[in-house]
Amino acid sequence: VRHFDAGKTIMNSNLYTTTIVPMMRTLENLLVLIDKAVAFAATKKTGEKDFTDALLNDRLVFDQFPFIRQIQIACDNAKAAAARLSKQEPPSMPDTEKTADELKARIQKTLEFMKTVAPESIIGNEEITITMPPYYKKQYGGETLSGYEYATQYALPNFYFHATTAYAILRKNGVPVGKSD
C-alpha cells in the first residue's frame, strides 16, 4: 500500500512500518517521560521518601497495574511483536525492575532487540500464522491469528494501552508532560 500526497509517494506502508517503527518511537518517548518524572519527583517529597518511588508504584485505580508494570508490559508487547512478526520467539526479560534507571535499561534492551529485526523479515508476513500464548485462548477464545490480525487486533492495541496508561499515571501525579510527549 502506498500513501500519496499530490501524486508523490510519501512512504510505503507495510507490516514493519505500521507496527515496529511506531512502537520503537513510542518506547523512545517513554524514556523521555521517565526522565521528566524523575526530574519532577526531585522537586517533591513524600515524608522521608523520594517521590520517584511513589510515581513508579502508583496506578490509576486500585485494580490496575502500577507504572512500573505498565512499562514492563509495553516492552513485552513491543519485543513480542518484533519477534512473532519475524517468525522468532520473543526473548525473555524477567520483570525485576524497581527503579527509573532499571526501567530505562529495560526499554533500551527492548529497543536493541527490535533494531536487530530486519524489516525484510517482517514485510509481507500479513498472512503468517501466529500461535498465541495459552492465556490468549482463555481470554479471547482463539489459538492463532494471522500476522495482520496479530499486529492490528492484539499487538498495537495492547502496546498503546500500556504506554498510554503509563503516561496517564504521570499526568495524574502532576508530572509536566503533554500531548507532544
Where are these regions (language model features)?
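Short, helix-capping/interhelical loops that line the mouth of catalytic, cofactor-
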Residues: 71-113, 132-135
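Acidic interhelical loop/turn segments
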Residues: 42-56, 116-151
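Long, well-ordered alpha-helical segments
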Residues: 30-45, 163-170
